[in-house]
Amino acid sequence: MADVRKDLEALKIAMQTEEEGQQLFKTASANTKNSFVKSIFDRLAKDELLHMDLIKKFYAQLEHSGSWKELSPQDRDYRSAKQEMKTIFSSALEKAKAGNLNVSESDVEVYRRAVQFEKDGADLYDRLYNETDDKLAKKFYLFLREMEKEHMNLLDNTLQYLDNPNNWYLLEEGWTLDD
């Protein structure tokens, strides 16, 4: 039972971390005047809610039964932000071509903090993975870590885009805004 209590405490920390991320992204969205930046942070805030729901589900299961359960196909069918982000980036392309993609230094700074926050989240799930012997718990923490890494990569990619849209398109898409 001691291991279950330890696992429940770990899941509480995970829920708090996801809640902090959701608040960070909501606040960032509310404080920006840039529609591109706002749409990215809105999407990430939505994803953090999905993460919290998944953790709460596993917390309740563990608290009730005293054991971990396998991630179901529905749990694994986490809808990543990738497709929605393609749409957001396409819209930003039009603004960048028109010279209307104005990004403030505070937006860039929030992106940097968000990248670090997601890295810290991935590190947390790595630590929790290493601290448990339960195979199902390991799978769960690995899954959460991959979601955090997806966000970290998205934020890093977006930051590169904000720093230099023309170079981003050249590297990512093989063409420039002048083509």
Where are these regions (language model features)?
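Non-heme di-metal
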Residues: 1-179
